[in-house]
């Protein structure tokens, strides 16, 4: 399985984790369990009514 990129909520660093081998999701730098999946940087267009 490919690595997934997450952003730590506590220290703000990007973390690459291999989900097939990792049992618990923690930041390897600060140990925080709160990780966010970063949004794509592509802007969305919403049509106004």
From Swiss-Prot:
Cofactor note: Binds 1 zinc ion.
Keywords per UniProt: Cytoplasm, DNA-directed RNA polymerase, Metal-binding, Nucleotidyltransferase, Transcription, Transferase, Zinc
Catalytic activity: RNA(n) + a ribonucleoside 5'-triphosphate = RNA(n+1) + diphosphate
One Gene Ontology term of the molecular function aspect: DNA binding
Ligand binding (Zn(2+)): 11, 27, 30
Domain of life: Archaea
Compartment list: Cytoplasm
GO cellular component terms, semicolon-separated: cytoplasm; DNA-directed RNA polymerase complex
Gene3D superfamilies: RNA polymerase ii, chain L
Keyword Electron transport among record annotations: no
EC number: 2.7.7.6
Main subcellular location of this protein, as a coarse class: cytoplasm
One Pfam family of this chain: Zn_ribbon_RPAB4
Cofactor(s) required, per the database record: Zn(2+)
GO biological processes: DNA-templated transcription
Subunit structure as annotated in this protein's UniProt entry: Part of the RNA polymerase complex.
Function recorded in the entry: DNA-dependent RNA polymerase (RNAP) catalyzes the transcription of DNA into RNA using the four ribonucleoside triphosphates as substrates.
Membership in a protein family: Belongs to the archaeal Rpo12/eukaryotic RPC10 RNA polymerase subunit family.
Protein name as catalogued: DNA-directed RNA polymerase subunit Rpo12
UniProt organism field: Pyrococcus horikoshii (strain ATCC 700860 / DSM 12428 / JCM 9974 / NBRC 100139 / OT-3)
């Amino acid at each position: 399985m490919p690595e997934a990129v997450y952003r730590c909520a506590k220290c703000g660093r990007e973390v690459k984790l291999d989900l097939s081998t990792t049992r618990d999701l923690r930041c390897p730098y600060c140990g925080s369990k709160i990780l966010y999946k970063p949004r794509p940087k592509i802007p969305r267009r919403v049509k106004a009514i």
